[in-house]
Amino acid sequence: MAGGFFFGLFNLSVVIDQSFTYCYHLDMARPRAFDETVVLEQARTLFAAQGYNGTSIDDLVKSTGLLRGSLYKAFGSKRNLFEMVLIDLAGRFDFSEESLDLLTVALKDLAPVDKRVREICSQITGSQIERFARLLGTNLLAKMKEN
């Protein structure tokens, strides 16, 4: 029983020590020296113009001005960065040429092989179908009132 008690204390001290170390590292981390929104916009422009497969990490580094390590630390991978750009697009799809180009890139380059990208594309197109229906309905009602 005593062995179990001491083993439990040891495990508790390891958890506390790991927790302290984790908190210490969080406090000592440097704040980001870039605006994530700006980086997403720059990546969005690049992906829309060059496609997903046509955009390299070097292209993203040049476009965003981030170091390669900072890009990977902030976003994990080119694929994750693209997903974040798509999620941002889903929140503010504006029917601009760039938005349509990016959606086309997602549907063509990644959606056939990536379930998460397919889901985001469905969310974008599904929400826009409702918008089209509302706009069309409003337009039809206006035409009917004219007659």
What name fits each language-model region?
Residues 85, 89, 110-111, 144:
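Generic structural signal for hydrophobic core residues of well-folded globular domains
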Residues 98-139:
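Amphipathic alpha-helical segments used for helix-helix packing
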Residues 1-28:
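Short, intrinsically disordered or compositionally biased N-terminal tails of bacterial proteins
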Residues 34-38, 42-80, 84:
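Helix-turn-helix
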